[in-house]
A protein has these predicted regions:
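Amphipathic alpha-helical linker/stalk segments
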Residues: 42-70, 79, 117
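Hydrophobic alpha-helical segments that form the core
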Residues: 126-148, 158-168
Length: 174
């Protein structure tokens, strides 16, 4: 319900009353549990980040398999919640207090950066800031979503994980 209302009305335009109505609960219940709209948003983002954290995104020693796994997970995230993520990114310049909401996803990105750094240290990837490498790897997924291809099958067909990893490695593998 949080995602639907905020995507439809924007963060500033969404009210807890609208969110409660969409969720089929009393607004007072939302206030008791979350306190405010930002905490509702934080809870939703944390749930997605925990889902990402539980998807076995750890170093395995197999560079292509790890990169493909990262691409698949982000692709699934964009299919499931891309519209919310894009809305959140567009709202950050206008609502800087929302930056707190992104703490868990930022921690997940740093974790993935440590995996890429390890491959760099092993000489399997060129040296560059790990978050730059991560952005280069998953950037096409975000770009596809920004261009309006959030419809699940289109996004999945537009960005084929193994092909994306091969293209990424053409310029970055040692």
């Amino acid at each position: 319900a949080v995602a639907d209302v905020i995507v439809e009305r924007g963060y500033a335009g969404a009210t807890t009353k609208q969110i409660a109505a969409k969720a089929g609960v009393n607004e007072v219940t939302l206030f008791r549990r979350f306190g405010n709209k930002k905490n509702l948003m934080r809870s939703m983002v944390q749930q997605e980040a925990m889902r990402l954290g539980g998807m076995d995104l750890d170093y395995s020693g197999d560079l292509e398999a790890d990169l493909t796994n990262i691409v698949r997970v982000y692709q699934q995230l964009m299919v499931r919640r891309g519209h919310v993520l894009l809305m959140l990114l567009s709202e950050l310049p206008k609502q800087p207090d929302l930056l707190e909401v992104t703490e868990m996803p930022q921690a997940q990105a740093r974790h993935l950066g440590t995996i890429l750094r390890r491959y760099q240290e092993e000489g399997k990837l060129v040296e560059e800031p790990p978050l730059v490498a991560l952005s280069s790897l998953i950037g096409p997924i975000f770009m596809s979503a920004m261009l309006g291809s959030l419809e699940a099958t289109l996004l999945q067909n537009l960005v084929e994980p193994q092909q994306l990893v091969k293209q990424f490695l053409q310029g970055r593998a040692n």
